[in-house]
Amino acid sequence: MKHLRQTVLFILLGFLLTACHHTADRLLSIEQLIKLKPDSALSLLRQIQYPEKLSDSNRALYALLMTQVINQSSDEEHKSDSLISVAIDYYKGTTDSVHAALAYYNAGLVAMDNEDSEASLHNFLKTIDWLGESDNDELQFMVRYKMSRLFNLRLIPDEELRLGKAALPYAERTGNPLYICALLPYITHGFMQTNQLDSAYKYSVQAIQLAEKENLVRALSHIYSQHAHLCMAMKDYKQALMYRDKDLAILFELFGEENEYIYDHYINKANTLTELHQYDSAFYYINKAVEDTTDIQYTTRKSLAKAEIYAATGQMDSAYYYMNRHADLRDRLIEERDKEGLLTLHRNYHNDELKKANTRLWQQAVERKLQLYVVTIVCCLAILLGGCIYFFLSLIPQHFDLTLFISS
């Protein structure tokens, strides 16, 4: 009976070990599949039963992969960050910098989806810390690109520009033109908002040329729209209208003429037509942009566009009404975005980075001083030795045959 129990125990143990190895191998296979076929990866992950009963390492990898595949899916939505927290809690206590960086990056994406800017920025900064000098150019690019977008949404153009420029070398090293074309409009916008229009124009033209060459249609819509904004800032309204029409032509082909995504572009065209004194057409497009009170940013822009059209046509009462509405909405928008919290977090991170940099510089200075001391001591010893040799030779009589002295 005792032998039977031992046999059964060994069989169960072997089965469990095999199952553990099988699950680990399966998760590693899914990890390789995510980039190529995220839908298939999601289906395979859902086939894993009782993930909460997996080992700590497998459960962390499962949580990371599930979050990652949901982030890549347009159909799935996050409800909370509890899943990715499992991965972070595990990997932050290990030396696995690859998975730790991925965990924090995906946590940043979840927070971004949930409109929690501070949590998003915190996780992106932790991603950069874990990446260090890693040669993972794609993730190095993506985290800085997402941070640039975050500051774009929060109306902080100097940080949008700084992070966009920091992301560009990594995008270029990946060799993926889509990454470059996605990033360049944010660099352009950062230069525009900091009144560096010549630099903005340079990057905008670069984006247009690359996107047209690679036929990146969806990217071209954003690039054309951004270039039209730039032309407006440079008061080249005819050029701006041309790029507005190019942008809308792409959007009509992709979504049709009546789509909530296009309404914002109608506002942009109305603004351009107002500057060209084509007021009837401006009213036509501003009225095509339907009212959407749930999107404060959209309603703010529409109110300003209406105010400018009414003012240009001498309808000052209506212009005054929409200008006041625009001012109220913009104040509310800035208040809700809580720029100060975001800036404080980023400023603290910069201070920590400066402290680290100063420590490295101090260590380098100490090393240089030590090297200088060593060189000085060696030189002094060499001079002293040379002096001793010279003194010894000076004591020898001039007619003394040194060879005889040595041979003796």
Residue ranges and their predicted role:
Residues 63, 100-111, 123, 140-151, ...:
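TPR/Sel1-like alpha-solenoid repeat signature
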Residues 20-82, 93, 98:
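N-terminal leader/linker segments that initiate helical-solenoid repeat arrays
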Residues 57-60, 98, 138, 178, ...:
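Residue signature of alpha-solenoid helical repeat architecture, marking inter-repeat boundaries
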Residues 46-51, 85-92, 125-132, 165-175, ...:
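Amphipathic alpha-helical segments of tetratricopeptide repeats
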Residues 33-47, 74-86, 116-126, 156-165, ...:
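Helix-turn-helix repeat elements of alpha-solenoid scaffolds
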